[in-house]
Structures are given as C-alpha cells and as structure tokens.
C-alpha cells in the first residue's frame, strides 16, 4: 500500500484531516500482540481511548481505502452513539463511493443509526429495501433479512 495507496493525494487529505496514523510492523511487540496483528497490511481504526471500531486486512486501492477509512470513522461515532456525526459520514460513502465494498455496510449502519436516534422502525425496513435493490448479493443484505418481519 506504500507504493500505491498511501501516496494518493485524496488518501493523504483524509488521513491528515481526520486521523493520526501510526505504522506498526506485524511482528513488532507488544503492539502486534495487543491489537492481534497477524498479517500486513492491517489497518485498524481506533478511537482516542484505543478502542477498536473497524479493521481491514490486505491491500486496498485508494478507491476502496478511502471509503473504508470513512466507515471506520463513522463506526467510531456510531459505537459511542454519536449518530449525528456518524450519519453524514455514512451518507458521504453512499454518495461518493456507492460501488465500494464499504457501501453495503454503510447502508446498514446508517439505517441502524437512524433507527436508534428516532426509534422509527421504517428506517430498518429501508435498510433491507435499499440493500436488496443496490447490493443484492452482499452479506449485509442477508443480515438485514429479519427487518422484513417488521
């Protein structure tokens, strides 16, 4: 990723704007053990307290890496119930990276965030509907199937 992804201008911009990157070799102790790093590259999104919210393993090109980073940041906010911060990031993924591997999960997490912030079950139904229409073979579509019972 050092030759292709990390030097990308858009990748640099998002990292400089939102993140504090640290690079750890997969066999560097004690961090490799603490974060269960088994292969490289492993990219982990942590919050300021060191709690993990998102992880990718293996090479990602810039067009996949950027939405993955954004999803990680959104999940940091989501996990701390800061839905008003998570939702715009998830919507940005869906608007600007709709074909990315992160997009189906962004649909799912966005819908759950909307539900948790409003308690309106229609948002859960919308998750399944959108996933079936736009990402029918995604694992996130399968995970949303129970929402058809609402």
Residue ranges and their predicted role:
Residues 33, 66-100, 116, 134:
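Alpha-helical segment of the N-proximal tetratricopeptide repeat
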Residues 78, 111-115, 149-150:
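Specific register positions within alpha-helical solenoid repeats of the TPR/Sel1-like families, i.e.
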């Amino acid at each position: 990723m050092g030759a292709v992804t990390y030097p990308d201008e858009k990748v640099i911009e998002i990292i400089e704007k939102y993140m504090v990157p640290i690079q750890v070799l997969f066999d560097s102790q004690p961090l490799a053990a603490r974060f269960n790093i088994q292969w490289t590259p492993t990219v982990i999104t942590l919050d300021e307290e060191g709690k993990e919210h998102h992880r990718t393993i293996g090479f990602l090109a810039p067009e996949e890496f950027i939405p993955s980073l954004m999803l990680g940041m959104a999940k940091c906010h989501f996990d701390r119930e800061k839905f008003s911060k998570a939702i715009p990031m998830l919507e940005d993924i869906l608007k600007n990276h709709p074909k990315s591997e992160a997009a189906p999960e962004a649909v799912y997490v966005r819908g759950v965030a909307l539900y948790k912030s409003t308690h309106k079950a229609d948002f859960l139904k919308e998750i399944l509907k959108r996933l079936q229409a736009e990402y029918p073979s995604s694992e996130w579509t399968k995970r949303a199937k129970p929402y058809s019972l609402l």
